[in-house]
Amino acid sequence: DSTNINFFNPSSYSRLSKGNTLMSLGLDSRFSFYEQAGVSEFKTSTMFDHFSLAFKATKRSGFAFGLKPYSNVGYEFSQSIFTGIDSVRYTYAGRGNLQDAYAGFAFAPISSSRSNLSFGANISYLFGFVSNERKSELLNAETNPGGLSLDLTRLSSFHYQLGAHFEHRIGKSNLILVGISIDPEQDFNGSLENSLYTSANIN
């Protein structure tokens, strides 16, 4: 589609409409419903999804760049368990996101009114962090002793993606279209921190 930015397949940039700069801005809204042991909870969240700009460079080529999500984490829930003497509350929470700042180019060696064959690539930089934690505490103890386990992942690495696109028109009303996007196996630079805290009162 020459009026939409398909940043999941970089070969599509060569099919953009000539003379127009396309911009895409997205927001992501999530509605979550949790229920356990008769207790229910409803949560909503809205976050930035993506921003992209794309334009036709020549008759056979196109460019695009922007910022898109690579991974998002956002949750929090808890449960209480009676141990026979006291109740222990476990709280699980995850937050953070990995962002993908990318620039892409596509070229079509075959471009006619009947057939089109295009190849493209995105070069991007991945960055961000994701944390997952588990917290426990005794509810009825005077000092509320407990503990906290925290896993923190940080990512800072380059990444690339390849794409191909072929279409051929048969008659006036039939079109064969095949697209492929390849995300090769790659090594990312990052770090993983595992921490365990114990205290008489963790807040």
Residue ranges and their predicted role:
Residues D1, R60-N203:
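Outer-membrane beta-barrel porins/channels
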Residues D1-S71:
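N-terminal, post-signal peptide beta-strand-biased segments of exported outer-membrane/organellar beta-barrel
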